[in-house]
Amino acid sequence: MASEAPSPPSPSPPPPASPEPELAQLRRKVEKLERELRSCRRQVREVEKLLQHTERLYRNAESDNQELRTQVEELSKILHCGKNEDNPKSDVEVQTESQAPWAISDYYYQTCYNDDSLPSKETELCVQQSQCAQASALDPQDESHIDSGSYAGADATEGVSHRQEDAVTSDSQESVSALAEGPALEGSSLAESLRAAAEAAVSQTGFTYDESTGLYFDHSTGFYYDSENQLYYDPSTGIYYYCDVESGRYQFHSRVDLQPYQTSSTKPNRERRLKKRRKEPGFYTANEEKDLSSEDQKVCSVEYINCSEDEHSGNVKKKARTDTSHKSSPLQLTVAVSGDTVESPGDDNSASSKDERIGESESEPEEGEITDSQSEKSYDGDSSSGDRETSEESDDEDEERIWPPCIRVIVIRSPVLQMGSLFIITAVSPATIGREKDMEHTVRIPEVAVSKFHAEVYFDHDLQSYVLVDQGSQNGTIVNGKQILQPKTKCDPYVLEHGDEVKIGETVLSFHIHPGSETCDGCEPGQVRAHLRLDRKDEPLVGPALSKEEKELERRKALKKIRVKYGLQNTDYEAEKALKNPKYKDRAGKRREQVGSEGTFQRDDAPASVHSEITDSNKGRKMLEKMGWKRGEGLGKDGGGMKTPIQLQLRRTHAGLGTGKLSSIDDVHLIQNKSKKHWDKARERFAETFTENKPRKETPGAVPWVTGTAE
């Protein structure tokens, strides 16, 4: 039986695949995913930034839209108020203010116009007319003694003024009716037609147009309206007001100085009365009409030049007060103020000679007015002087209430401001004191010790004086050497007086309170700087030499000023402030402890000598050996140079060159100088004395010392 063929060997199983390629693929996938994740995060951040920017733009747009809505509402209200008014093109003389008519309760004139306390002005006007008619019927010769009325600005009128008013009113009504009926009026131009229409429209608002002056008179308030400047004029005080639409009140704008014309008899009385008032403690809080502050006059947008006494002295004698309030305008007006005749600045050529003759014949002269018939008529001096005094006192009180004084601030001492600088503070608006540049302070003091908004000065109408309020400053405020408050706390109002010195930081300010434009030598910049220059001249140019203690004192003072300048007066000097910081690491100290340092600065080699050989570590010897030199050979290329060292030669002290033979240091014995000899002798004497006194100390004190030897 044949043997079976051997079976082929079974194939071996394939070896398992190595995990390395799979791991590499996984790593690549992970890296790819990480890159994608980073890119996604970057995109998300960009989208978030874009979203924030869009939201910010949306908020800004919403705020702008809200502001526009409020503006549209305000404009719609204004349009609603003036939709019934017609504003045709007209001449400048008849332009009116496009505002709704104000009620009597809306007028405001220094707290004198109230809805409940004051009656209607038309009723007062009628009462004044009846009083004037009765007074003229009882005593026609004493017409000059009739008072102008309790209400200033509305004069008593007579028949002439009524006839003129009726004529003007009838003309305006006829012109309006003619315009309504036909296209044009015969014998009248287009300007006259427009003027008549404007007068008819204005008459409905309570204003009456005055053709001679081009102004409008309001019977309810007694004010004249200037359409060019949109101002209201009070003829009794010479004050101009503007109408505040938001509050519905008259606000002060400017004032015309009414220059009084007084007789020789009234001037001494007024001077005596002013002297008495100066002695009173509250006099400096009042302001006369002539004591206007120059700064207050600069605020006025419309300036009026007062007529001089020389220019109008002749006109005052000719003009008398007419009863028509329409022809007595604020620019050409003669009214009774404090019993004196006062004429406002204006154009004297506008009134005709015929009107002047009518005024002379049918009107009464003002009280205290200088007329041609004054020399012929005698007046009751006692009654007239009494009336004048009472009226002047009342007007003085009005002026005190209307015109508070101003403050002139002078820089007395300051490291940053020029000494003698002047700052003026008025009662119109509060004044601020601080360091910040962008806050537009009245008195800016660029010091470190001064806060950004340090203090505020304003006029308190209740106290009738200026007050200082510290706004919680860092270092506080000092007035006359006393600190009015603790730092960082807002203080109560501090009443300022004339001559107070206020210290803010290192700056000292002097406050001078004067009525009107009055000044003193202490608040005039020229006077102050002149005194400072004189003080500098008196100082010696070259001072005496300072001692060491005085120099140290000056150094300490200068150091203290530097600390105050940079705000370091409350901090102590620290020598090693950086080393005391816990975050500081002294790496140099650790390196010195661990590694150490070689003292290369300390020389440890022995000095050179001609008797000892140079060591192998000598750098000069090493250089010679590198160049081929060997021990025992001479210098040079062939070794034929010198072999012995250079000997040290000495010469005599203080001897010139070539005076003696140089000798070697080995052959010369150093001669001791005189001082060394003296020291040696002193040592010998000391040694002898010490050896002689030493046995004496050892012997007892009771036994006397005896020379000689004892047996």
Curated annotation (Swiss-Prot):
Name of the protein in its database record: Angiogenic factor with G patch and FHA domains 1
The G-patch domain, residue ranges: 616-662
SUPFAM superfamilies, per the entry: SMAD/FHA domain
Chain segments carrying region Disordered: 1-23, 137-184, 260-297, 311-400, 579-623, 690-711
Molecular function in Gene Ontology: identical protein binding; nucleic acid binding
One BP term from GO: cell adhesion
Keyword vocabulary terms for this entry: Acetylation, Angiogenesis, Coiled coil, Cytoplasm, Developmental protein, Differentiation, Phosphoprotein, Secreted
One Gene Ontology term, aspect cellular component: extracellular region
Record carries keyword Secreted: yes
CDD domains per record: FHA_AGGF1, OCRE_VG5Q
InterPro entries in the cross-refs: AGGF1 (IPR053027), AGGF1_OCRE (IPR035624), FHA_dom (IPR000253), G_patch_dom (IPR000467), OCRE (IPR041591), SMAD_FHA_dom_sf (IPR008984)
Residue ranges with Basic and acidic residues bias: 287-297, 374-391, 579-606, 613-623, 690-699
Chain positions with Phosphoserine modification: S7, S12, S344
Lineage: Eukaryota, Metazoa, Chordata, Craniata, Vertebrata
Polar residues bias: start-end ranges: 167-176
Record has Membrane as a keyword: no
Location within or outside the cell: Cytoplasm; Secreted
N-acetylalanine PTM sites in chain numbering: A2
Modified residues (N6-acetyllysine): K661
Acidic residues bias locations: 361-370
Coiled coil spans: 19-85
Function, in words: Promotes angiogenesis and the proliferation of endothelial cells. Able to bind to endothelial cells and promote cell proliferation, suggesting that it may act in an autocrine fashion.
Organism this protein belongs to: Mus musculus (Mouse)
